Amino acid sequence: MAKEQVQAITKMEEDFAQWYTDIVKKAELVDYSSVKGCMILRPYGYALWENMQKVMDEKLKATGHENVYMPMFIPESLLQKEKDHVEGFAPEVAWVTHGGDEKLAERLCVRPTSETLFCEHFSKIVQSYNDLPKLYNQWCSVVRWEKTTRPFLRTTEFLWQEGHTIHETAEESQAETLNILNLYASFCEDYLAIPVIKGQKTEKEKFAGAKATYTIESLMHDGKALQTGTSHNFGTNFSEAFDIKFLDRNGKWQYVHQTSWGVSTRMIGGLIMVHSDNNGLVMPPKVAPVQVVIVPIAQHKEGVLAKAIELQGHIQKVARVKIDASNKTPGWKFNEYEMKGIPIRLEVGPKDIEKNQVVLVRRDTKEKEFISMDQLEERIPALLEEIHNSLFNKAKVFRDENTYSVTSFEEMKKVADEKQGFIKAMWCGEVACEEKLKEEVGVSSRCMPFEQEHLADECVCCGKEAKQMVYWGKAY
């Protein structure tokens, strides 16, 4: 007999890390494997990723991007071609040294990212400006040998999409870089209900080998920042290293201008930490594997299960719906689907059938209402949209209430010690100040936002003339 009680989870106020771990396990998103840092995506977790993948894939294809697949292995000599790139990834690389019992003539890297493979391929297929642009995307897994791991947020192997494009001009590659960043931002806000801040990474924080890195940053329940997606403009850094040239419109050889960008299952970690509560997962409706669950009450009584099945037939025209007709108690089912974060629960029993109504319960607010069975097809899509907007607005209010503006080093240190959240402060642009803030205040630069504010004339750290406002914070 299955246990008739869903165990409680740790409260986020008591131990945020354990709260998060409890949710990913008890909501049956993942399980741990026998290899440290490698997670098993269970059906519910993978269905969530598939829904996210489907939306993103459609958006990329609609903007002219094509899916490809590159090998998992990269020869060491190929990885070494772009100096900054290899130095940036060297500590995290996993190496294959043997094939069977034989030692390989050259070590093979298990891809941490695929820039070098795409570059090698591009150098073979591009001759003229007529061959440009090339807009490629790949869905795959990558491996980075992380020391500290946590499901979705930082794992040894993770799933992602990585886009790689080459262009005729610097203007085109810059436009592509920002268009993708905007696509990521709209995906987070319009589908995951996560508000983001768009901006540029500092030189210290940018991607290894990039000319410029742009990011979307979001704020978690514990006041830490999460880098949710990045888009990189490589300029000609990689094309020069890999000799990717084309004949331009004047018959002269030029290097291509290149971009790279990606989002991963890390977004799922963000979704959990932005929306969930002490009762479990809260799923944003647009990507939820199941949007509506029907729980028959006293299903052994005549007509109850048949009515639930009839309702499912109507609702499946407008939402992803399932019936739980198992022999577990209604109480167990209520707890189970609350833990799994299903946006809407419908309860239908003999008395409800008599009144031609169902009990509708929202996961996000716990609000309960009686609704006519005849209105479900119309009401459910509107309610799912309402839930999405409510989740987004709640997360935005939380972010704004936990964002602080400071104008002095002492004020910044006090806020960082006493509060959790984003800190906005002016910066001179010097790496030395960035490193001092990291060491003495415990915050890193999250981004130089596109929407700038003039908080003061001086750098918060050294007092010299400030060049821009920066979002700072503790981060995953």
From Swiss-Prot:
Pfam families: HGTP_anticodon, ProRS-C_1, tRNA-synt_2b. It catalyses: tRNA(Pro) + L-proline + ATP = L-prolyl-tRNA(Pro) + AMP + diphosphate. The gene is proS2. Its main location: cytoplasm. It comes from Bacillus thuringiensis subsp. konkukian (strain 97-27). HAMAP family: Pro_tRNA_synth_type3. One of its GO terms (biological process) is prolyl-tRNA aminoacylation. Homodimer. One of its GO terms (molecular function) is transferase activity. One of its GO terms (cellular component) is aminoacyl-tRNA synthetase multienzyme complex. Keywords: Aminoacyl-tRNA synthetase, ATP-binding, Cytoplasm, Ligase, Nucleotide-binding, Protein biosynthesis. Consists of three domains: the N-terminal catalytic domain, the anticodon-binding domain and the C-terminal extension. It comes from the Bacteria. It is found in: Cytoplasm. Its EC number is 6.1.1.15. It is an enzyme of class 6 (ligase). Belongs to the class-II aminoacyl-tRNA synthetase family. ProS type 3 subfamily. This is Proline--tRNA ligase 2. Catalyzes the attachment of proline to tRNA(Pro) in a two-step reaction: proline is first activated by ATP to form Pro-AMP and then transferred to the acceptor end of tRNA(Pro). The keyword Cell division does not apply. InterPro entries: aa-tRNA-synt_IIb, aa-tRNA-synth_II, aa-tRNA-synth_II/BPL/LPL, Anticodon-bd, Anticodon-bd_dom_sf, Pro-tRNA-ligase_IIa, Pro-tRNA-ligase_IIa_arc-type, Pro-tRNA_ligase_II_C.
